Amino acid sequence: MPAPTSRSASEMQAHPLSDEQLLDLVQRQTFRYFWEGAHPLSGLALDRCHRRTDEPDTPVSVGGSGFAAMALIVGCERGWVSREQAQARLAAMLDCLEKATCYHGMYPHFMRGDTGATVPFSRKDDGADLVETSLLFQGLLCARAYFDREIPEETRLRERIGWLWREAEWSWFTRGGRKVLTWHWSPTNGFAVDHEIRGWNECLITYLLAVSAPRYAVPAELYHDGWAMSRDFINRRPFEGVELPLGPPWGGPLFLAHFSFCGLDPRGLHDRYADYWEQNVNHTRINYAYCVRNPHRYRGYGPDCWGLTAGDTPGGYTAHAPDNDRGVITPAAALASFPYAAREAMAALRHFYQDLGDRIWGRFGFVDGFSEQQEWYADTFLAISQGPIIAMIENYRSGLLWKLFMGIPEIQAGLLKLGFRSPHLA
């Protein structure tokens, strides 16, 4: 795939790109993370890549590979790769997923990209990760919907994804019938991590998939009695003058408005608890307003430099939010928020590209984070940051992934079971 041309600052000032040209450039350059930066054998998404050299033995990210499937759809639709190339890459990914070590049909957080063997995330987290697996299936189910032609290659792709989807035992993660899902399980440690999945956070997609599953579904009551019965679920308090329907104070990191909603369309989506478009728009507005107010007086923050979410810092990976502000801006926070705050996101995009330029722009798009206060610019790109940039910009531009996911029969049935209302269900 030919590399998009990077231009000098003087060239950009003399001949600035239009909004559409800039979106094209950023999506396409970021796509390279999942195309050229993927594992060389399986094509699954590496957890992270570096600006110039790659670390040996970097594990693949299961959730990031779900975003990779979405990126392949966008790349195919926009003509960066052919339909046949995208099919072949997905087939290679499925080759690894089919032979990988999984646990009651669920995958670990990290695994080897050649053998599919589990790479432990921590001492006790050496087995299934229900949320990472959910992000994987969100992408694979979109791919199953997109590759819909009645030709042998696409029929086989759909069958293979369908088999993985049917074999995922969501019900196992109720621990014998509890009214809540549990995040982790392993053969050696069982449920020792003991992390119940309760809202509000990035895990709405997990409950939706668990209720929608074709074979090992869980009852809808788990959504209401487990997910929604948390002290951090209902909020309805103002922050930065904006009411936040759900979630922790200040809304938490912005990826909460992105991960579940790369496929799940929040426009017009309601249930008894919230209007999810309002939730995500208001969360974004709070994050933006906080960065503009900049109570810590960090250098660089402002109307064209904002966005707090999980990402790399000089001291490691951290979940940035208004109540955990380290002076680090993560470009994915603003760029994946185009559907919710297009004007503010475009201002940030232009500043990132035109003003900060090569300090944060590289072979796979924007690096994971930067701090002008500390004069620090990340050397890394992360799958779970790059993926939502591509997916959410595409949803802003065309709604492609939202249309695919919301048209899936099992998902429509699951939304109805949970009591959701959506224009897609009319």
Task: Please name every model-derived segment.
Residues 2-426:
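Ser/Thr/Asn(+Pro)-rich, low-complexity disordered segments
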